[in-house]
C-alpha cells in the first residue's frame, strides 16, 4: 500500500490525468489501453482488459477469456510528448493467473531462474534507427530536409547530423528527464540513421526502456515530419540497424560483476564464468538468431560474401559468423573491455523481452555445462575468404529466417527460454516466410520482365 500511495502522490505532482497500461505482442509492438488516473486502483488490482485473439501471438481465440494487463508501478514513465499521460509496463493475467504468453512475464520467469542461480543479468542495448520520409507512391528515402545528408560515409559527420540535432536533442532531453542516463548520440553509418546510448541496468528495466524508446521515437519524429523506423534494413545499399547488446552477470548478493579477471591467460580480462557464458551464447548462436533477428528483412543485414562491401560506406558493420574476439567489430561478439562483451548480431526489430530471455538462457547453459568458447579470433573476419572460414571450422550465422527457425526448432534451451511462446513464435515465423516467398519483388520484375 505504501508503494501505491507513493505513486498516487507522484501522479498528482506530475499532473498526470491518464494512464497507459502497456504490454507487447509477440513481435515486441507496444499495445495499450488508456484509462483516467482515477482508475489507478483498478489497474493495480485487476488490470485493463484485452481480447487476446486481436493480438499477435497471444495464444487465444475469439472464445477465450480476457487478458488483463496489470501495471507495474516501478515502470512509471511520463510521456514527454504528452505531459498529462504516463505509461506503465504491464504483465498479463487470465482468470487471475499470470499468463505465460506475455513476453514480459516470460522474461521475468527466466530472470528469476538466473537469480536463483546466484546472478543478476545486466544489459545495455544500443538502438539504431532511421528517420525516413514516405512518398505518395509508397517509396521511402532517408529524412534529409536540408539535402546535406548524402555522404557515402556519413558516420559521425557534423554536417550530416546537424539537421537532426533538434530531433535528437528533443529525444535525449526527454529520456534524461526520465533518468535514463543518455551519455552519447551520433549519426550512424547510413544516411538518416542515428544511435542513442543510455545506461546499463538490469535486463527487465532495459527491455522496458527499449520498448518505450520505440514509442518515443515514433511520436517525437512526427514533430519533425519524419517516420522513425526500427526496421533492420530499410535500404539495400545502406548499413542496417542493430540493437547491439552489452552484457554481464553480477553477483546477486554483492551486485559486483563476475565477468572481469585481469589474470586471464587469453588476454581479454575475462573470468572463467564469463567464458563459460560466452561459450553458451556461441553454442546456441544460430538458434538465437531466430529470436534476436526475427524478420525476413533482418537477414538482408546478416549477409555473407560480396554483400560485405555492397553498402555505400564500404562495410556492413554486421557479423556473419559465430565468433568472438578482442575489441574487433567484425566479430559476432566483441570484447569491448575487461569482462565487457557486446553482441553485434541483434537486429533493431528484436522483441527485447524474448531476445534477452533467450540470450541469458543460452549463457546460463554455458555456465552449467562449463562450455569453452575456444580461443578468440583476433583478425578481420571481413578479410577472410569463405574457403578460409569453412576450413577454420567457424560456423556461419543463418542466412534466412527459414534457416534460423529450423535452428530454433532443434534447440531445446532456447525454446525452453521462450516457454509456451516458442510454438506460437515458430508458427508465425513460418507463415511470415511462406508469405515472403509468395511475393514478386520490384527487382524480379526489373530483372526478368523482358529478359527472355
Residue ranges and their predicted role:
Residues 1-452:
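Glycine-rich, acidic/polar active-site loops that bind/position phosphate-bearing ligands
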Amino acid at each position: 500500500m505504501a508503494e501505491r500511495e507513493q505513486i498516487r502522490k507522484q501522479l498528482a505532482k506530475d499532473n498526470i490525468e491518464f494512464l497507459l497500461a502497456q504490454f507487447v505482442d509477440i513481435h515486441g509492438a507496444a499495445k495499450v489501453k488508456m484509462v483516467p488516473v482515477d482508475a489507478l486502483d483498478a489497474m493495480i488490482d485487476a488490470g485493463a482488459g484485452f481480447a487476446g485473439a486481436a493480438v499477435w501471438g497471444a495464444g487465444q481465440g475469439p472464445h477465450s477469456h480476457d487478458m488483463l494487463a496489470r501495471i507495474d508501478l516501478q515502470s512509471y514513465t511520463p510521456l514527454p510528448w504528452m505531459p498529462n499521460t504516463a505509461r506503465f509496463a504491464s504483465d498479463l493475467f487470465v482468470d487471475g493467473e499470470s499468463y505465460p504468453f506475455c513476453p514480459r512475464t516470460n522474461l521475468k520467469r527466466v530472470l528469476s531462474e538466473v537469480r536463483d542461480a546466484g546472478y543478476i543479468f545486466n544489459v545495455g542495448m544500443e538502438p539504431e534507427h532511421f528517420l525516413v520520409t514516405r512518398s505518395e507512391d509508397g517509396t521511402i528515402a532517408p529524412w534529409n530536409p536540408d539535402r546535406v545528408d548524402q555522404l557515402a560515409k556519413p558516420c559521425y559527420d557534423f554536417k550530416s547530423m546537424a539537421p537532426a540535432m533538434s530531433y535528437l536533442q528533443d529525444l535525449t532531453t526527454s529520456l534524461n528527464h526520465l533518468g535514463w542516463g543518455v551519455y552519447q548520440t551520433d549519426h550512424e553509418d547510413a544516411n538518416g540513421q542515428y544511435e542513442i546510448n543510455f545506461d546499463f541496468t538490469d535486463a527487465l528495466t532495459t527491455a522496458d526502456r527499449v520498448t518505450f524508446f520505440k514509442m518515443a521515437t515514433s511520436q517525437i519524429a512526427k514533430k519533425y515530419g519524419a517516420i522513425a523506423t526500427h526496421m533492420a534494413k530499410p535500404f539495400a545499399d545502406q548499413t542496417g540497424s542493430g540493437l547491439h547488446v552489452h552484457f554481464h552477470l553480477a553477483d546477486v548478493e554483492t551486485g559486483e560483476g563476475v565477468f572481469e579477471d585481469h589474470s586471464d591467460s587469453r588476454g581479454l580480462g575475462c573470468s572463467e564464468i564469463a567464458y563459460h557464458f560466452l561459450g553458451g551464447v556461441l553454442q546456441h548462436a544460430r538458434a538465437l538468431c531466430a529470436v534476436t533477428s526475427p524478420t525476413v528483412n533482418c537477414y538482408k543485414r546478416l549477409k555473407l560474401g560480396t554483400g560485405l562491401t555492397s553498402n555505400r560506406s564500404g562495410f556492413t558493420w554486421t557479423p556473419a559468423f559465430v565468433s568472438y574476439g578482442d575489441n574487433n567489430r567484425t566479430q559476432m561478439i566483441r570484447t569491448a573491455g575487461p569482462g565487457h562483451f557486446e553482441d553485434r548480431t541483434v537486429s533493431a526489430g528484436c522483441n527485447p523481452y524474448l531476445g534477452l530471455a533467450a540470450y541469458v538462457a543460452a549463457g546460463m547453459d554455458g555456465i552449467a555445462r562449463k562450455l569453452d568458447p575456444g580461443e578468440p579470433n583476433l583478425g578481420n573476419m571481413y578479410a577472410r575468404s569463405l574457403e578460409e572460414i569453412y576450413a577454420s571450422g567457424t560456423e556461419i550465422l543463418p542466412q534466412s529466417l527459414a534457416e534460423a527457425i529450423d535452428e530454433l526448432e532443434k534447440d531445446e534451451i532456447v525454446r525452453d527460454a521462450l516457454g509456451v511462446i516458442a510454438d506460437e513464435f515458430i508458427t508465425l515465423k513460418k507463415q511470415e516466410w511462406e508469405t515472403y516467398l509468395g511475393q514478386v519483388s520490384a527487382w524480379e520484375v526489373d530483372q526478368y520482365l523482358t529478359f527472355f
